[in-house]
């Protein structure tokens, strides 16, 4: 009987407890969330201000400084940022109807300097070529531009220029090592000197970096015809290929992202604008920036580092087509534009060198550094398979170009350079370290030193 009473009492208390429970106050909780966030934001600002880190945090854009330096900021023809596109990059590019977009002149960062003509060069390039100058232009995309390099001096253009001028100085120091301007009459002496390398034209060699991140062959063709030829180049060097593999075949050239949506779809443009504004509002708060800068330290992926002129998310393999017909169209576009480039340079009497740019899957995996092995693993097997198929097609296209114009173009394959590349050459799928750029510059130099237009050809001996 007693146990029954205790059970009833316990049951009664349990019911009373159940009746006393109340639902959570959802509205006060929802209201308190922004209040707490505001208080945390104010507290973060106070702490940052007291510690004297305000300027340091204000300069942080959610990525390492060198990444922010090289990210593109897209400007319209009025030189104002596009509504709906990120404006966190420091490398300003402006829309141009003919070439898609181009670098804004007279800008600099800790990593690069762009001259008033819009070339990556420390000094201006006058339209009228100085009498003693031998002028060479380097065209291409981000690899030729020198993406992620610490300064202008680490780029292919700068290293090639130094190598060419070193050759001229060497000719002056040791003239006996090169073929003389006048050949000897006697055969015994002639047989000796004809084995010596020809002298290169003497003068001040200048290699101008006209590459623009994101450019494909269509951009380069328009750039050459409209912007480069007026500068009277003595030779043209092109380093490209990769962008044509990731650019859909229905596009003639790389353009500012989402421009078709902006022009033809007002609701779509407005939605992109709202999304970007909300994203910037959140990521610009001291709370988020402080958490990223001092705690999370986010690093861009290999795909993000390799894709420089797109705001579309996704991995590199998504930009490389799995459709063989689409791949043929992309490579066919590349081949057609290269033919037109050869036609232009041939008509102007300008030597042309076309280099198929390096890519990390072209290296022997046993020769990759631990960092490069991690990049390759992150890119994945699907990417590797697709990019190798693409490069095989590009290589065939360049071989056909060389066969069609044997006297007007020299093609080079940089996809596999294991013997000449340093231990660590790649910072992502396609961009190179200074040491990697030096290997390319040396290969370009060897070819250029053999171009008849850049050589001193001695007269034939009198018989």
State each model region's role:
Residues 243-396:
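Serine-dependent acyl-ester chemistry module
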Residues 228, 232-237:
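Proline-aspartate-enriched helix->loop->beta-strand connector
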Residues 40-42, 346-364, 369-371, 387-423, ...:
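Extracellular serine-dependent O-acyl
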Residues 142-145, 212-217, 242-247, 359-362, ...:
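Solvent-exposed loop/turn segments at secondary-structure junctions
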């Amino acid at each position: 009987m007693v146990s029954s009473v205790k059970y009833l009492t316990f049951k009664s208390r349990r019911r009373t407890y159940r009746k006393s429970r109340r639902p959570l106050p959802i509205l006060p909780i929802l209201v308190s969330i922004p209040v707490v966030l505001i208080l945390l934001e104010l507290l973060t600002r106070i702490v940052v201000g007291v510690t004297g880190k305000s300027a340091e945090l204000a300069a942080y854009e959610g990525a390492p400084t060198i990444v922010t330096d090289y990210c593109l900021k897209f400007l319209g023809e009025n030189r104002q940022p596009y509504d709906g596109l990120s404006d966190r990059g420091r490398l300003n590019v402006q829309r141009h109807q003919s070439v898609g977009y181009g670098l804004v002149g007279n800008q600099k960062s800790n990593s690069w300097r762009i001259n008033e003509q819009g070339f990556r060069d420390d000094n201006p390039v006058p339209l009228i070529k100085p009498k003693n100058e031998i002028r060479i232009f380097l065209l291409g995309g981000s690899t030729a531009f020198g993406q992620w390099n610490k300064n202008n001096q680490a780029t292919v253009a700068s290293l090639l220029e130094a190598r060419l001028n070193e050759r001229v100085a060497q000719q002056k120091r040791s003239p006996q090592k090169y073929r003389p301007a006048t050949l000897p009459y006697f055969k015994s002496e002639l047989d000796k000197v004809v084995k010596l390398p020809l002298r290169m034209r003497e003068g001040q060699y200048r290699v101008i970096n006209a590459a623009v991140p994101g450019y494909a062959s269509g951009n380069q063709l328009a750039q050459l015809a409209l912007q480069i030829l007026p500068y009277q180049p003595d030779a043209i060097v092109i380093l490209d290929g990769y962008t044509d593999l990731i650019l859909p075949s229905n596009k003639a050239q790389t353009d500012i992202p989402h421009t078709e949506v902006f022009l033809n779809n007002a609701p779509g443009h407005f939605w992109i604008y709202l999304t970007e504004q909300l994203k910037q509002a959140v990521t610009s708060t001291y709370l988020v920036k402080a958490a990223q800068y001092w705690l999370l330290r986010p690093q861009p992926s290999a795909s993000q580092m390799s894709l420089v002129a797109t705001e579309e998310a996704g991995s590199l393999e998504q930009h490389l087509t799995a459709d063989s017909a689409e791949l043929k169209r992309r490579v066919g576009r590349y081949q057609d534009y290269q033919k037109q480039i050869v036609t232009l340079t041939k008509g102007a009497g300008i030597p042309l060198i076309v280099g198929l740019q390096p890519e990390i899957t072209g290296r022997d995996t046993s020769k990759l550094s631990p960092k490069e092995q991690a990049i390759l693993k992150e890119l994945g097997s699907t990417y590797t398979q697709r990019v190798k198929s693409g490069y095989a097609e590009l290589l065939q296209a360049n071989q056909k170009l060389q066969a069609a114009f044997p006297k007007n173009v020299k093609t080079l394959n940089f996809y596999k350079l294991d013997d000449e590349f340093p231990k660590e050459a790649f910072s992502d799928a396609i961009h190179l370290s200074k040491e990697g750029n030096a290997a390319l510059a040396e290969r370009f130099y060897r070819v250029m030193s053999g171009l008849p237009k850049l050589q001193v050809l001695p007269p034939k001996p009198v018989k």
